[in-house]
Regions:
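Short helix-loop capping/hinge motifs at secondary-structure junctions, enriched
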Residues: 18-19, 39-40, 132-137, 169-170, ...
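Alpha-helical membrane-targeting segments
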Residues: 283, 287-322, 326-328
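Active-site substrate-recognition segment that forms the wall
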Residues: 137-171, 177, 181, 185-190, ...
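Conserved mid-domain beta->alpha element of the FAD-binding
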Residues: 99-100, 127, 150, 184, ...
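Short gly/ser/thr-rich secondary-structure transition/capping motifs
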Residues: 66-67, 81-82, 142-143, 205-214
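A short coil-to-beta-strand element that immediately follows conserved catalytic motifs
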Residues: 119-124, 136-137, 181-182, 193-208
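Conserved N-terminal helical subregion
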Residues: 4-130, 168-185, 326-328
Length: 328
């Protein structure tokens, strides 16, 4: 996962940024290539890491503040009128409010936002794994209908690699389906294998379909508020999925504190602050996917020329990264 400045600011405010950075990697550059040739080198301010490390840091802080996590509780149903949540172990809890951050397959969204659409295949499938390499920068490699991104996630050489293919052949939406290295290499046979040398040291390699849902008109229903992928699943081509979830959570928390947990007041303000930004970045991520996977060589040449000789990339990232929730 990569966390950009817009999401690092909330972590800083929560007092956990430094711990997260210490467990992660801070690359200085993002380098773009097309068919083996470098076309752009940019300064970057992101922290690259693994989801495990990010969750560890958040969990440690949460438990340290007296937070509680209920294990062996699988969600079954929610009665929004009585404010009761039922779990498959037959435990029932009465609550004042529900923050549903249960992913693209969100049961809360499906049951309580009935006209919000279902997950649909985006037209992209992705390979991922973690191996060993000596790279110190974020490395993007573009090719016809494909792209690869590699980046270090710690100081021990562990490197994340993701390869995306534009294909009409839908793959299941699961991060747990193992693929073969041979099939991965076949999908990226037009690339120099040195680009993904870390694949050979990866214990496993996974393949999954990238799915989307329609943009919402509202993130709130009665006493239920959606966050993260439950509200706005997005293709990963701007690296903002996790960042938007952090922004959502921090925004809701800050508003709840300022308004004394009066959720009737919190919800409309939360939606006013978050809905337009989330939907805009969701849409921009889809557009970036089209730019990343151009097949026509003339159009690809034009894209590369613009990337190489204009500040468009820097301007786009700055617009996303400079956002501050406290100023929203």
């Amino acid at each position: 996962i990569s966390i950009s400045p817009n999401a690092l600011r909330p972590l800083q405010k929560l007092g956990i940024k430094d711990d997260f950075v210490d467990r992660s990697f801070v690359p200085e550059k993002a380098v773009m290539h097309y068919q083996g040739k470098e076309i752009k080198r940019l300064d970057t301010e992101v922290v690259t890491s693994s989801r495990q490390k990010l969750i560890e840091v958040i969990h440690q802080s949460y438990v340290g503040l007296g937070g509680e996590i209920l294990f062996e509780h699988e969600y079954k149903s929610l009665d929004a009128d009585s404010c009761e949540i039922t779990f498959t172990n037959n435990e029932v809890y009465k609550v004042s409010h529900v923050l549903a951050c249960d992913g693209i397959k969100s049961s809360a969204r499906q049951n309580h936002f009935p006209s919000s659409g279902v997950p649909a295949y985006s037209g992209y499938s992705a390979w991922r794994g973690i191996g060993l390499s000596e790279i110190k920068d974020i490395q993007f490699h573009f090719g016809p209908g494909t792209h690869i991104v590699n980046y270090p996630i710690d100081h021990e050489g562990r490197t994340s690699f993701v390869g995306v293919v534009k294909t009409n052949e839908a793959t299941e939406d699961s991060w747990k389906i193992k693929g073969s290295k041979e099939a991965f290499l076949e999908d990226f046979k037009f690339y120099d294998e040195e680009i993904f040398s870390m694949v050979s040291s990866s214990e496993d390699i996974y393949k999954w379909g990238i799915y989307i849902r329609p943009s919402l008109n509202s993130m709130c229903s009665k006493n239920i508020t959606l966050l993260g992928d439950a509200a706005h699943p997005m293709v990963p081509f701007l690296g903002q999925g996790g960042c938007m979830a952090i922004e959502d959570a921090y925004t809701f928390g800050i508003l709840s504190g300022k308004l004394g947990c009066d959720f009737n007041k919190v919800q409309p303000l939360y939606e006013k602050i978050r809905l337009q930004r989330n939907n805009r970045i969701q849409s921009a991520s889809m557009l970036q996917g089209k730019l990343n996977h151009i097949k026509n060589p003339i159009v690809a040449f034009t894209r590369n020329l613009l990337m190489s000789h204009t500040p468009l990339l820097a301007m786009r990232t700055e617009k996303i990264w400079n956002y501050s929730i406290d100023e929203a």
